[in-house]
Amino acid sequence: MNHSADNTADTNIATGTPVAYAELHCVSNFSFLRGASHPQELVQQAVALGYQGLAITDECSLAGVVRAWQALQDLQQETQKDPSLAAKLENFRLIIGSEFHCDDHIFVVLVTDKKAYSELCRLITTCRRAAEKGTYLFNPGQLFDLQHCLLLWQPQQSFYAQPQQSQQPQQTQQAEFTRRLSHHFAHRLW
């Protein structure tokens, strides 16, 4: 999470108004050896900083979402005592998501509604059932089963490199995958 020195959201220099910001990829301590903070701490900090939203996106898991949601409910109870907190929570949105790794690519799937939530749960279940306990098996082709989710994609570094003669088939496959992904997700891919 980005933290400003005075613990408030960044402001537009020209107008002095707060800039709307939502963290769309944040892992909690439920992503073993990667996330350091408890989901409830992440929610509390995001609200304190004036974020408009926070996506809890643990790796092939929704484990952190329940505690994040509970923390948000607890904060809403405190608004009766703290009107400034009520103002910060008014437009705050907890976003449900999960990240998936494959060949140094990172895919972050975000939920927009109940249908998207169902799709994400199905994807996580499929990936977990295909592997030994504690791991998962994800194939990027599974993304084409998602009709309602949003997708953030961070390709591997070599994806951007100039292809060498021996890498032409791989580059052609990557270009085709990118085209298919862009077509399937249309305005839902970043």
Language model segments and positions:
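Phosphodiester-processing cores and adjacent nucleic acid-binding clamps
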Residues: 1-190
